[in-house]
């Protein structure tokens, strides 16, 4: 069953995996009623579709904290509940739209369903790179996102990542030339993350800028 289509939380809960290594705060939060309706519709559809992908003894919930200025999102595994938390700074970011919001939720889900490589040998969370790959290879396609919407969403979401981590904005027409000598279990460079999303969408090999085999 679906625990809840929309849960607003005003306090932080235990963190297991976040889409960004750090958070910055928006100077001003401006979440309009239209944005809230968009989020409600997106969350309900996401939970309904994603529930079918989870083990039968697990539930999914998206928790929103619209008053918190942090620009970030996190996933927490609470026994049989997979809870995705999205903070207000991310919700109200100018680059956030239905497709980029879906891609963000899919990335967080990817920490649970993305598979190896995992962040630790005894943990359950896929690495950031693997979560990015899963989000594009599987999850957003299940949600009916088309290629044009995906490209815009991938560029928008990684531009937010670049802004928060103070990196150059990633570009579709270039690739990260780095070659990893071992798998990156942390946060790849923003251009590498965009490359990973594109590779996932095209079902191509995971980029060498973070993945080593």
Residue ranges of predicted features:
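Solvent-exposed, polar/charged alpha-helical surfaces in well-ordered, non-transmembrane soluble domains
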Residues: 44, 48, 103, 129-133, ...
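C-terminal capping/extension segments of zinc metalloprotease domains
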Residues: 17-94, 140-213
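Catalytic Zn2+-binding segment of zinc metalloproteases
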Residues: 109-124, 137-144
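Long alpha-helical scaffolds
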Residues: 3, 70-74, 106, 131, ...
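N-terminal signal peptide c-region/cleavage motif recognized by signal peptidases
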Residues: 12-14
């Amino acid at each position: 069953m679906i625990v809840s289509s929309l849960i607003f939380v005003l306090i932080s809960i235990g963190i297991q995996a976040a889409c960004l290594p750090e958070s910055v705060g928006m100077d001003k939060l401006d979440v309009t009623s239209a944005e809230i309706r968009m989020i409600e519709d997106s969350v309900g559809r996401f939970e309904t579709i994603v529930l079918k992908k989870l083990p039968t003894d697990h539930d999914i919930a998206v928790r929103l904290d619209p008053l918190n200025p942090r620009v970030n999102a996190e996933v927490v595994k609470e026994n049989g509940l997979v809870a995705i938390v999205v903070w207000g700074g991310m919700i109200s970011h100018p680059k956030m739209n239905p497709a980029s919001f879906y891609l963000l939720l899919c990335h967080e889900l990817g920490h649970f369903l993305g598979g190896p490589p995992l962040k630790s040998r005894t943990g359950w969370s896929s690495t950031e790179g693997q979560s990015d790959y899963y989000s594009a290879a599987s999850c957003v396609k299940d949600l009916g996102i088309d290629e044009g919407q995906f490209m815009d969403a991938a560029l928008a979401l990684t531009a937010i990542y670049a802004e928060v981590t103070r990196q150059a904005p990633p570009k579709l027409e270039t690739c990260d030339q780095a070659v990893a000598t071992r798998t990156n279990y942390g946060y790849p460079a923003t251009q590498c993350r965009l490359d990973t999303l594109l590779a996932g969408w095209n079902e191509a090999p995971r980029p060498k800028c973070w993945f080593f085999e």
